[in-house]
Amino acid sequence: MVQRLTLRRRLSYNTKSNKRRVVRTPGGRLVYLYVKKQRTVPKCGQCKEKLSGIKPSRPSERPRMCRRLKTVTRTFGGVLCHRCLRERIIRAFLIDEQKVVKVLKAQQLGKPVSKPPKIAKAPAAAAAAKPAKTATKSK
C-alpha cells in the first residue's frame, strides 16, 4: 500500500509558487519537498542579453547577496552588457567631437559661437516695493 502524504503548507493548489516533489527521508517516510523557482540571471537593459559574471538568483535573495556576486567592476556593471556599453561610450565620444568641430569651424570663420540666452531674474528690490494687498470684506 502507498503511504499517504500530508501537505506541510495550507495551499493545496499546484501553482507556480507551490510546486512539490516527493522525497524519501532517511527514516524511510515519504514527504513533500517544496521546490523553489528557478533562479535567473539579470539581463542587459538595452539588448536583453543575459549578463555574464553575475550569479543567478531570485529577486528576494539579491539584498542578502554581497556586491561582488551582483555586479561586475565596470561602468554600468550589472546593468548593461559590454557590447552595449562600448557602443554608448563611442557614441558619446563622437557627439562630443562633433561639438568641438562645430566650435572650431565657427572660430575659423570669425563668428562668435552662439550660446543659449540666459534668463535674467527680476530684482528682489522691485518685488519688495509693491504694496501688499489687504483683504477687506464687503457686505
Swiss-Prot record:
One of its GO terms (molecular function) is structural constituent of ribosome. Gene3D superfamilies: 6.20.340.10, 6.20.370.70. Coiled coil: none annotated. One of its GO terms (biological process) is translation. GO terms for cellular component: ribonucleoprotein complex; ribosome. It holds the Pfam family Ribosomal_L34e. InterPro entries: Ribosomal_eL34 (IPR008195), Ribosomal_eL34_C_sf (IPR038562), Ribosomal_eL34_CS (IPR018065), Ribosomal_L34e_arc-type (IPR047868). Keywords: Ribonucleoprotein, Ribosomal protein. Residues 113-139 are annotated as: Disordered. Belongs to the eukaryotic ribosomal protein eL34 family. PANTHER family: 60S RIBOSOMAL PROTEIN L34. This is Large ribosomal subunit protein eL34.
